[in-house]
Every structure is written in C-alpha cells, then in structure tokens.
Swiss-Prot record:
Enzyme class: transferase
Gene name in the database record: panB
Name of the protein described by the UniProt record: 3-methyl-2-oxobutanoate hydroxymethyltransferase
UniProt GO cellular component terms: cytoplasm
Source taxonomy: Bacteria, Bacillati, Bacillota, Bacilli, Bacillales
A Pfam entry, by short name: Pantoate_transf
Cofactor note: Binds 1 Mg(2+) ion per subunit.
Entry EC number(s): 2.1.2.11
Entry's Gene Ontology molecular function annotations: 3-methyl-2-oxobutanoate hydroxymethyltransferase activity; magnesium ion binding
Keyword match Metal-binding: yes
C-alpha cells in the first residue's frame, strides 16, 4: 500500500514514480497489477470516456462515480482524484464540502487542483484541515479557454519565472505533489530541482520525479490522435476493432455460436414442456 511516505522514499532513492489515469474498475485493476505507483482519476474522463470536447462539463457526481469504481479495482494503490471545474473557487465552505465528498465517498488518498493564485490559498486551507492536495501547473485543461488552447506553457522568460514561483508557492502552501503539464523540459528540470515534493510530468521531459499518462493513450484505445508527449505501448483500437468485426461476421454467417457455446437439457423434459407429443 503506497502512502506519501513511501512515495517520498522512492523519490529520495531516485526511483521514478509512475502515475496512470484510470476511470473504472477494470482499468484500475490492470494498472495496479502492472505496478503503477499512483492512479489519477482525472477529469480528463470527460473527453476520454464520456465524449465531451473538454473537461468543463464534468461534474462532482461524475468524479465520485468513477473514483468509487477505481478504488474498488485498486485497493492498494495511491489514488489521486481531480476536483472538477468550478468546485473549488469562491466560497470555501462549498469547496470543503466538495473535497470532503471525494475523500469520504470517493475514497481518494489525495485530491488535485489546477492553477495558482487563489487556488494555492485553497490548497493551504484544505491541507490545514487534513486533506492532502496535489497542485497542477503549466497547461491546466480547465483553463484552456483562458490559455487560448492546448499550448506549451512557460516558454518566455516572464512565463517561466511565473511558473517557477508558482511551483515554489504550491509547495509552501502545503501541496504534497506537483503535476507539471506541457512545460519545456529545461524549466521542468529546474522546478524539480528546486522543490522537495515529487514533481510528476506530462509533456515535461524526463528530468522530473515521475511521469503520468492517460490509460487510453498508453493503450491507444478509443483515441484517434495522440499528443506529441505520448508513447503508446499497444494499439487496442486495431485489436478491438478486428475482434468486434470478427464477432459481427461470425454471427451473421452462422459460425457463432457453436455447440461448445450452448447449453442442453433432457429432450423428455422439453416434450413435457409442450404437453408431450
């Protein structure tokens, strides 16, 4: 069973941390059996499994539904759950109630919040009441409208300095971990060197403390285009499509089901069912 203590021990021993998204029982079960260190129940589920064009429509009920399923499939893995869009801005009591549900009902080990500024104050307050938080900086999908699309962040001197300072502020606020998304690898390396908490990269190069990728991207399952930073380790699109096509063809041509797929009963019972001959 991984805890923040065991994860920090791995980091301090220079062992890379591996995080993978999972959105349901079977994906979580496979991820745990494969040996990932952390599972992220990301609001990316909105696009990957619910068919939305962004993470914005994802609700708290969506996150709870999927996090419960993931925990049932991965009972011994550290699970981080995203706070969905607009659930942690404004009134803190409302934020606290939402966060509490992810821990109590969703059985999260930590929750992830995107952004800096007021978000870091929220992280600090949640940490003070005993709720472990993960910060998410760089490309933050919930703010993609403000960021003018899915672009690499921190490429200018001013943007890089802001990102570095925000990362340091996230650690000071009490964040237990930082996810850096779509950041130049040189900047990500500098940030990882400055922080004492694990820095998990996605599109942030190799010189951070660990990596996170989306389950469906790693398996090329149900996705058409992969981001530049993704390495697919299988092509389940092809495998699954071929398998389903075979099922369709064999059903239509009468090759399925065969005798080995069927059940039998005593013919005399069948006769009795119809009142005999």
């Amino acid at each position: 069973m991984h805890t923040m203590t065991t994860l920090l021990k791995k980091m301090n021993e220079q062992e890379k941390l591996v995080m993978l998204t999972a959105y349901d029982y079977p994906s979580a079960k496979l991820a745990e059996s494969a040996g990932v260190d952390l599972i992220l129940v990301g609001d990316s589920l909105g696009m990957v499994v619910l068919g939305y064009d962004s993470t914005i429509p994802v609700t708290m009920e969506d996150m709870l539904h999927h996090s419960k399923a993931v925990r049932r499939g991965a009972q011994h893995t550290f699970v981080v759950v995203d706070m969905p869009f607009a659930s942690y801005h404004g009134d803190f009591d409302r934020t606290l109630q939402a966060a509490s549900r992810l821990f109590q009902e969703g059985r999260a080990d930590a929750i992830k919040l995107e952004g800096a500024g007021d978000v870091l104050q929220t992280i600090e307050r949640l940490t003070q009441v005993g709720m472990p938080c993960v910060a998410h900086l760089g490309l933050t999908p919930q703010s993609v409208g403000v960021l003018e699309g899915y672009k690499v962040q921190g490429k200018s001197l001013e943007a890089a300095e802001t990102l570095l300072q925000d990362s340091l502020a996230a650690e000071r606020a009490g964040a237990k971990m930082l996810v850096l998304e779509c950041v130049p690898h040189q900047l990500a390396k500098r940030i990882a060197e400055e922080l004492t908490i694990p820095v998990i990269g996605i599109g942030a190069g190799a010189d951070v403390d660990g990596q996170v990728l989306v389950y469906h991207d790693v398996l090329k399952y149900g996705v058409d285009r992969l981001p530049k930073f993704v390495q697919a380790y299988a092509d389940l699109n092809e495998v699954a499509t071929d398998a389903i096509r075979s099922y369709v063809e064999e059903t239509k041509n009468g090759h399925f089901p065969q005798e080995r797929h069927t059940f039998t009963m005593d013919e005399s019972l069948l006769d009795s069912l119809y009142g005999g001959k």
